[in-house]
């Protein structure tokens, strides 16, 4: 089973008091606690490590590409937790370990080690981190113009845009007997009920939080399920073109690390995903208790599409 152990990272000091500090990442993992207690830290680290493991398995990167500095500044910086490694004395005291299905990783006080497991059964996942700031999506169309937005939110906006393009006749929501329809001509999502229609940007805060979460989760869960049910193997020529594209990306010295990551992810999307790891911050955000329950039931339904899917929520 995949698991993680964390000490001296941001608000997390001694870590989990049980099982020698290890936290199992089960099919459904729920992190509950007071505000500022480190719930999101755990979720963001799980997201980071699962992405690195996926990139290594897929061949996007080699182990040697992940130095301690790059892990801290680039990959943890993606989730804006790069400064969580340092205590009040500006000393790096963080201790983080991750045991995945294919790789083990350990960060300890400035040193980062990765080792490959000999015996493994790995299911290539579609990983989605759902930030708490997702309600901004309802009112922002050109996210790229907002340079201060978190990278995780920018990536979520990309998936949101992909998902809304897949809405055909409408998509029923799990609350209020409502549904959403996408007006492609005006690039507007409308929330409709039995006797009303309103643009998402003008809808209640509950709809503005729920629609991005539900739509992207629905879209990705079904996309992965289709790939599992109808796997497509690359032909010899397609495989050769893929290898050539990867080599070309690595040879391009003008690319930044982030640009290279995006390019490799785009090329590697040809691989069939066989699992969906949905990491959700605050699924209950701005929702009435009955609506919270219905949203949770939907997330659990998507998670049950495959035995290999995982749901992590804070």
Regions found by a protein language model. Name each.
Residues 1-185, 192-193, 266-270, 304-309:
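P-loop NTPase switch/coupling surface
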């Amino acid at each position: 089973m995949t698991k993680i152990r964390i000490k001296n990272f941001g608000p997390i000091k001694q870590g989990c008091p049980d099982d020698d500090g290890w936290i199992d990442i089960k099919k459904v993992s729920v992190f509950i606690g007071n505000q500022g207690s480190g719930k999101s830290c755990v979720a963001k680290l799980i997201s980071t490590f699962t992405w690195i493991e996926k990139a290594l398995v897929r061949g996007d990167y080699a182990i040697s590409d992940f130095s301690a500095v790059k892990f801290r500044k680039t990959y943890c910086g993606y989730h804006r937790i790069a400064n969580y490694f340092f205590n009040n004395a500006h000393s790096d005291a963080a201790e983080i370990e991750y045991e995945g299905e294919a790789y083990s990783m350990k960060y300890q006080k400035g040193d980062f080690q990765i080792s490959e497991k000999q015996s493994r059964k790995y299911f290539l996942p579609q990983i989605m981190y759902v930030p708490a700031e997702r309600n901004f999506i309802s009112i922002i169309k050109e996210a790229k113009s907002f340079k201060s937005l978190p990278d995780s939110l920018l990536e979520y906006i990309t998936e949101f845009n992909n998902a809304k393009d897949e809405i055909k006749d409408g998509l029923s929501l799990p609350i209020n007997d409502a549904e959403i329809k996408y007006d492609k001509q005006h690039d507007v999502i409308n929330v409709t009920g039995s006797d009303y229609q309103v643009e998402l940007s003008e809808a209640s805060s509950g709809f503005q939080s729920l629609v991005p979460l539900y739509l992207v989760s629905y879209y990705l869960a079904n996309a992965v399920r289709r790939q599992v049910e109808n796997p497509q193997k690359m032909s010899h020529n397609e495989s050769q073109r893929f290898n050539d594209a990867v080599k070309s990306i690595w040879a391009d010295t003008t690319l930044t690390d982030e640009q290279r990551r995006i390019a490799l992810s785009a090329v590697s999307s040809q691989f069939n995903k066989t699992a969906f790891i949905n990491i959700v911050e605050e699924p209950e955000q701005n929702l009435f208790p009955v609506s919270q329950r219905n949203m949770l039931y939907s997330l659990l339904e998507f998670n049950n599409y495959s035995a290999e899917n995982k749901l992590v929520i804070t």
